[in-house]
Swiss-Prot record:
Source organism (scientific name): Sulfurisphaera tokodaii (strain DSM 16993 / JCM 10545 / NBRC 100140 / 7) (Sulfolobus tokodaii)
Gene: moaA
Record-linked SUPFAM superfamilies: Radical SAM enzymes (SSF102114)
Organism placement in taxonomy: Archaea, Thermoproteota, Thermoprotei, Sulfolobales, Sulfolobaceae
Residues at which [4Fe-4S] cluster 1 binds: C20, C24, C27
Membrane-spanning intervals of the chain: none
Function: Catalyzes the cyclization of GTP to (8S)-3',8-cyclo-7,8-dihydroguanosine 5'-triphosphate.
Name recorded for this polypeptide: Probable GTP 3',8-cyclase
Cofactor section: [4Fe-4S] cluster
GO BP annotations listed: Mo-molybdopterin cofactor biosynthetic process
Amino acid sequence: MIDRFGRSIEDLRVTLTHVCNFSCFFCHMEGEDNSQSLLSPEEISLVAKVGIEYGIRSVKLTGGEPTLRRDLLQIIRELKDVGIKEVSMTTNGVLLSTLAWKLKEVGLDRVNVSLHSLDKQLFKEITGVDALDKVIEGIKEAIKAGLRPLKLNFVLTKKNISQLDNIINFAIETGVDELHLIELHPVGLGKNTFEYHEKLESIEKILKERADKIEIRSKHYRPRYYLNNLVIEVVKPYANPIFCAGCNRIRLTADGKLKTCLYRQDKEIDIMDILRGDFSLEEKIELIREAYEIAIAIREPNFKYKVESYAPS
């Protein structure tokens, strides 16, 4: 199904929990407020199953830290059972060394692992946890288990810009498939720490000189730089109408809302009462369909082109 700006929805991002065993100072918290309510595996899979009718093909599990959900394996299994083609997860990686093979076995396809420093002291300063060795171990185990392409997420700030070369070399040597250089943006805790914002333009200039090949990813018009067997992708979502023009995501919050945009809290459809109301399964499915249709109808880019025609030529 296409929204009024010509954008399809193909990816459902599901926040499994707001709880995290890290405390990164810039966390955007998926643009959500803290909530104690958690959707069950059955509720998540039902929303995803109905979403397939509207174009959903992939589900990204996020948090908080999704590996803290004790029913994570069941959630992944049920998403696969209802027909989701790709299930991926963003994680801090600290529990990945013990979970990687189990995750692969139940159907998880790939992971994004957040890694913002290879210096132990700086890692602890950024995350609040002395766990760098465990994260590195988790990355290596995930690669062995076949959770690929394995992608590293590196949020660039004034604190860790000196770490970038080390991160690139580590990624190449370890067999990481992609490295995402992510611009700090003022959402969640990032609103209070934007003083650490570091522009990516100077980094891109260096990457252009070092890259074996450069291509532009059609979705979001992101540049991708090839260094040896590593792909480095630059992610600049904030105040970026090109990023919004290519957005194919809709979000399911931990407390049961369909959220149409990371940056907006005024365009959400609360479906918790549907999921937990006294309705038959058929009635729930029909009401969730209506919720998707409303969400798609009100969905709009947060950052727009200042022209009549929205999509870039």
